[in-house]
């Protein structure tokens, strides 16, 4: 190989190395192919969070067909379910004089107060009827402790009480997680941030989520996730056989 040709070849090779440095080994031709060490986390796709529910996320039902499609690409799937007691501490109705979407101070810090939602055993708390994730091995219920809310699938809002999900995933050899569901700026974001902090390579599939967007919370969530190294992708970035 002539000197000029060799120089061009080395420069091109170096450029490819730099471009690919931040991508997983399974990323080829612009697509991610989840392997046996990847897990899909489906967050709170429940009747309470879709139109007609007690805490509806705008267009929340639109995530269902997206999740159903990409779920086929995963051998490991975890589904979470918000599962509150009657009179839960996160409900505005529990606090005299408080209205939904106001805040209050609880023992673990500031808490957004919500309408009563996802109460254990009700149809409102059930998973969406059209959600089809046949490979799901675990349904993780969260938010069932009376005095503590739980946005994250990994840890409750007191930042002390683990749900056990991290240990479960690590025991199965999972290295990478893809987070989907409701709502982007609360339970999805908290789950993604905790996953990254706990050592998992973490992706949020944007078009498989929808947001509440309370006082700019969506923009803040994306900025925070980006700053912490959570990757933002679309469902079209995932290779589905």
Identify the meaning behind each predicted range.
Residues 1-17:
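N-terminal secretory signal peptides and thylakoid transit peptides that target proteins
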Residues 27-143, 171, 175, 197-204, ...:
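Active-site acidic carboxylates
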Residues 85-89, 148-149, 187-188:
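Short catalytic/ligand-binding loop motif for oxyanion handling, primarily in non-cytosolic enzymes
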Residues 133-168:
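Histidine/lysine/aspartate-rich catalytic loop segments that bind and position anionic ligands
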Residues 174-190, 204-210:
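Glycine-rich anion-binding loop/nest that anchors nucleotide
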Residues 189-197:
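Histidine-anchored nucleotide/phosphate-binding helix
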């Amino acid at each position: 190989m002539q000197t000029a040709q060799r120089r061009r070849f080395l420069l091109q090779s170096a450029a490819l190395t730099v471009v690919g440095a931040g991508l997983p080994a399974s990323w080829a031709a612009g697509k991610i192919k989840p392997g046996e060490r990847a897990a899909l986390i489906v967050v709170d796709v429940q009747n309470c969070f879709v139109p007609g529910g007690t805490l509806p996320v705008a267009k929340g039902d639109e995530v269902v067909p997206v999740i159903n499609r990409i779920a086929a690409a995963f051998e490991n799937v975890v589904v979470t379910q918000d599962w509150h007691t009657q009179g839960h501490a996160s409900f505005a109705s529990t606090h005299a004089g408080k209205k939904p979407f106001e805040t209050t101070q609880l023992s673990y810090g500031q808490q957004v107060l919500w309408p009563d939602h996802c109460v254990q055993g009700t149809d409102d708390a059930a998973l969406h009827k059209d959600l089809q994730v046949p490979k799901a091995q675990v349904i993780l219920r969260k938010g069932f402790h009376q005095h503590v809310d739980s946005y994250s699938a990994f840890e409750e809002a007191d930042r002390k009480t683990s749900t056990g999900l991290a240990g479960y995933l690590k025991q199965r050899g999972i290295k990478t997680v893809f987070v989907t569901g409701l709502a982007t700026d609360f339970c999805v974001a908290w789950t993604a941030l905790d996953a990254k902090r706990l050592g998992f390579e973490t992706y949020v599939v944007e078009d498989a989520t929808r947001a509440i967007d309370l006082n700019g919370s969506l923009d803040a969530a994306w900025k925070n996730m980006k700053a912490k190294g959570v990757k933002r992708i679309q469902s079209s970035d995932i290779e589905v056989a």
